[in-house]
């Protein structure tokens, strides 16, 4: 036992030095499976997934190591660490290998048998949130982020994830979002002022506006809402700077760079460097297109990057930041008596808060499909994350009330949560009326799929925006439910501006 303990101490030092291959060799050559403690199994698995030669085989072997370590010493700290890494590595392998099939029930059973010992365990909660994200179970995902918040074991990313996923939760009122936003603002790290450059107060010959985004690539939805604006601004009065926070770039990115006066990339910059880099641009206005969404720079924005900061498009709710001056909305989304529940001052565009640029594709007018089908077809091409139990209940009732009607559900993320959705629709007795479709290879084929739909159904409380504009562009009306805040009234605003309310 003493020799194994000594070996483990030596191996821990090698691991810190990132000599992963040597750690793997020493453990596998000097110990047998049955000799290894949970901590040694964990070290072996971590070395396999940290190694430069990481692949499907190494991940699979790491899974075996983590599982072995968990089962050897259940409910000990080392075993719980193994479980966290087992779950995380399972999700990683799922994402890397399209054909990889994993038994989610095993993960969930392991977790439930250990839950009371790890309610406040940060890696476990993060890992289980990843699992429920892929199972399209927002309610349980939220639970694990809530535990992180309550245990005070969180960072800014956890806070943003929790706030973002609450947008899928009908039980949160706008006052809850407002209070959480204040909590987030109070708990973000503050950059000492002596580390920051001064914000320029001298007006320049033109108004300089920065747009901050991680999503100017790959045909991301935000590009369709931003393109017309950047193509038509008055270059005599304005200078536009794209501030990109993504290491990737494609032809969409290049096209957008050609539309503006300047582009900078802050992906590799820490918050202090990023704030100073942006302050050096001498912006009059910074428009954040991300809010709480993935790859955001919320900590940077807390420290103010321009004279005025505005949240728009990418996140349809309050950020809670005291330094976020404005939120762009419209009268349909935020009522005047609700402004108190938004940390930002509301800028009301007269009709609609944003507009889609459409597509460079020829549209062919088609008759409604029910004329040839002799039955009515509903459809939703929204992300499956937005389809909760209440949405399923409402849609199921619609199918039951309209004789022989059908429903087409289509999403690019169909892999892991599909069986859960099918089970919920089956419970409601309508599964046989539903067709599930995956991602189309060509975007034109995605749009043409709308020709199979008579009416598009919107999700709630998290409305579709891009999918609603797509449906309308293809001549398909959208049935939406009136909401209670910005996020849940997007469909309402779109329809009201079309005179379809």
Where is each model-derived feature located?
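Alpha-helical solenoid repeat scaffolds of the TPR/TPR-like class and their adjacent stem/linker regions
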Residues: 1-375, 383, 393, 427-430, ...
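Short acidic (Asp/Glu) and glycine-rich catalytic loops that position anionic groups and cofactors
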Residues: 159-160, 283, 374, 399-405, ...
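Short, surface-exposed alpha-helical segments at coil->helix boundaries
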Residues: 227, 250-254, 392, 415-422, ...
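A conserved nucleotide-sugar
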Residues: 237-239, 396-427, 431-432
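Short, contiguous acidic/charged loop-to-helix segments that flank catalytic cores in large enzymes
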Residues: 265-266, 382-387, 412-414, 441, ...
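Generic hydrophobic alpha-helical scaffold/packing signal
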Residues: 275, 396-399, 422, 447, ...
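Catalytic binding pocket for nucleotide-activated donors in carbohydrate/polymer assembly enzymes
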Residues: 448, 455, 459-501
